[in-house]
From Swiss-Prot:
Entry-linked InterPro entries: Znf_C2H2_sf, Znf_C2H2_type
Positions with biased composition (Basic and acidic residues): 429-439
Domain of life: Eukaryota
Any Pfam family: zf-C2H2
Entry protein name: Transcription factor Sp9
Subcellular location, record wording: Nucleus
Motif (9aaTAD): 166-174
SMART domains recorded: ZnF_C2H2
Encoding gene, per UniProt annotation: sp9
SUPFAM superfamilies found in the cross-reference section: beta-beta-alpha zinc fingers
Keywords associated with the record: DNA-binding, Metal-binding, Nucleus, Repeat, Transcription, Transcription regulation, Zinc, Zinc-finger
Zn-finger (C2H2-type) residues: 308-332, 338-362, 368-390
Disulfide bonds: none
Gene Ontology CC terms, in alphabetical order: nucleus
Length: 439
């Protein structure tokens, strides 16, 4: 306590308990140990605000890496600190430092000397300072790339943002580049709203001569206004960067390739047409068509007949159309692609005309009428059969009536008409044929 009254601090050790005791003695003491130049304004307690004393604070000066030394008048957030100014500095009136400050000042002075000699340490500290310089003026920004589009449109951003050190995203430092990101005068806005696309022409000439005439040739024929064409050419120019140069010319190359392919295909087509004279006709795999294809020009007579035979052994049926032959082949394969959509029916047929005939049984339509007796029939073969009864005489009229009745009740099946007639009423068919034999 005697040393405290005389104004000298005891020489404490480095133990935490001794440091805590010294701090408590300072706080509880009302003697003018920590007298400040304006200590008359603070008369309470012995607790004084942290301020720099007349003597230099070694603690603040020994921490160069933790002080943010930024002095910018244009920035909204300025932090001006002196060479030794720090919030951690202790007030002291004695010109000579106390034991506490002396020990730590020697410690931090050694650190400062070592850090000044170490190049890696100084590089790290300078990096911290530069990051702090680029960080604090951008406190108001919400996006890391706002300097791209706010440099020319907003005046609240300080000028050092646009004129400061170039960061990693400032890749277009050339004033003649297509996007003026470092010009605070707003050249981006003026270039986007210019009336004529001459600037784009001058910029396109630096990339590739193939794109120099795109804006005039593409928009002069369509009648687009110069402003609209300029905006479109701007977006078109954005695609002409180095990464897209190999993509855009593929349209012209594709047209040339299509021309080459069409030429090659036309050559192949002419060769095939020379071997096959009737190229417009649908291809057929029947034996007659294959024989005519094998004979070449000598098989012109077979092609002229237009006969298509069934290739199934033992059948030998011949049709004049390929569609009829295909429908006939469904009889052999059992394929029935035509389905009745009537409620709860679902029957399937091999031919479309059979499906239409079957639908008449649901609707009750009788399309075919006899010109003699005015009777109506659902099927044309039933009508022709009925007409034979009129021409044969009165003997077959009774049978024709019975045939008409059965035709109204009969539902068509997926069988040939000959089998249907024989299966429904073989007696009538015999009577119908007997007058012909007699005559």
């Amino acid at each position: 306590m005697a040393t405290s009254i005389l104004g000298e601090e005891p020489r404490f050790g480095t133990t935490p308990l001794a440091m805590l005791a010294a701090t408590c003695n300072k706080i509880g003491n009302t003697s003018p140990l920590t007298t400040l130049p304006d200590s008359s304004a603070f008369s309470k307690g012995g607790f004084h605000p942290w301020k720099r004393s007349s003597s230099s604070c070694n603690l603040g000066s020994s921490l160069p890496g933790f002080t943010v030394a930024t002095s910018r008048s244009t920035s909204g957030l300025t932090t001006t600190t002196g060479a030794g100014n720090s919030a951690f500095c202790l007030a002291s009136t004695s010109p000579t430092s106390s034991a506490f400050s002396a020990e730590y000042s020697s410690l931090f002075s050694n650190t400062t000397s070592v850090s000044s000699q170490d190049s890696g340490q100084s590089a790290f500290i300078s990096k911290v300072h530069s990051s702090a310089d680029t960080l604090y003026p951008r406190v108001g920004m919400a996006h890391p790339y706002e300097s791209w589009y706010k440099s020319g449109f907003h005046s609240t951003i300080s000028g050092d943002v646009a004129n400061g050190a170039s960061t990693w995203w400032d890749v277009h430092t050339n004033p003649g580049s297509w996007l003026e990101v470092q010009n605070p005068a707003g050249t981006l806005q003026s270039s986007l709203h210019s009336g004529t696309p001459q600037a784009i022409h001058s910029q396109l000439s630096g990339y590739n001569p193939d794109f120099s005439s795109l804006t005039h040739s593409a928009f002069s024929s369509t009648g687009i206004s110069p402003t609209a064409s300029h905006l479109l050419s701007t977006s078109q120019h954005l695609l002409t960067q180095e990464g897209f140069k190999t993509v855009i010319p593929t349209y012209t190359d594709a047209s040339a390739t299509n021309a080459m392919i069409s030429g090659a295909s036309s050559g192949i087509g002419t060769s095939s047409r020379s071997s096959r004279r009737y190229s417009g006709r649908a291809t057929c795999d029947c034996p007659n068509c294959q024989e005519a294809e094998r004979l070449g020009p000598a098989g012109a007579s077979l092609r002229r007949k237009g006969l298509h035979s069934c290739h199934i052994p033992g059948c030998g049926k011949v049709y004049g159309k390929t569609s009829h032959l295909k429908a006939h082949l469904r009889w052999h394969t059992g394929e029935r692609p035509f389905v009745c959509n009537w409620l709860f029916c679902g029957k399937r047929f091999t031919r479309s005309d059979e499906l239409q005939r079957h639908l008449r049984t649901h609707t009750g339509e009788k399309r075919f009428a006899c010109p003699v007796c005015n009777k109506r029939f659902m099927r044309s073969d039933h009508l022709s059969k009925h007409i034979k009864t009129h021409t044969a005489g009165g003997g077959g009229k009774k049978g024709s009536d019975s045939d008409t009745d059965t035709s109204n009740l009969e539902t068509p099946r997926s069988e040939s008409p000959e089998l249907i007639l024989e299966g429904v009423n073989p007696r009538v068919t015999v009577k119908d044929q007997s007058p012909h034999h007699e005559s």
